[in-house]
Structures are given as structure tokens and as C-alpha cells.
């Protein structure tokens, strides 16, 4: 399963609850994007969440 290279975010699981409080499993997936970033001074293609990109924790390399 893919995960965010920087923050380690991956799919989270939980329950969908109806009005009668019946439960069924559901999942929340991070918005992963394939990006080329610098890792140890070298460009590398990795999966990074859109939130990580927007926050400026990492910058893309062209």
C-alpha cells in the first residue's frame, strides 16, 4: 500500500455510522501525488500527499 514518503500517512480505516448507529467499514485515503523531490541531494520519484506539498515541507524538482 502506498504511503506519504515524508509524513508516513497511509489509508486509515474506521466505521461509517448510520442514523440507527449501525456500522460498516470504510476508509479515508490521503491525496497522494507522485512527485520528484531531492533525497540526499539526488532527485527521486516518491509519493507525497497534496497536503505535504501545499504546506511547503517539500519542493518539487523539475
From Swiss-Prot:
Location of the region described as Disordered in the Swiss-Prot/TrEMBL record: 1-27
The record's GO molecular-function terms, alphabetically, read: structural constituent of ribosome
Record-level GO BP terms: translation
Q: Which InterPro entries match?
A: Bacterial_rp_bL28, Ribosomal_bL28, Ribosomal_bL28/bL31-like_sf, Ribosomal_bL28_bact-type, Ribosomal_bL28_sf
Composition-biased stretches (Polar residues):
9-25
GO cellular component annotations, sorted alphabetically? ribonucleoprotein complex; ribosome
Name one matching Pfam family: Ribosomal_L28
Alphabetized UniProt keyword annotations: Ribonucleoprotein, Ribosomal protein
PANTHER family documented for this protein = 50S RIBOSOMAL PROTEIN L28, LARGE RIBOSOMAL SUBUNIT PROTEIN BL28A
| HAMAP family named among the record's database cross-references | Ribosomal_bL28
Family per UniProt?
Answer: Belongs to the bacterial ribosomal protein bL28 family.
Protein name, entry field? Large ribosomal subunit protein bL28
Q: What is the lineage of its organism?
A: Bacteria, Bacillati, Bacillota, Bacilli, Lactobacillales
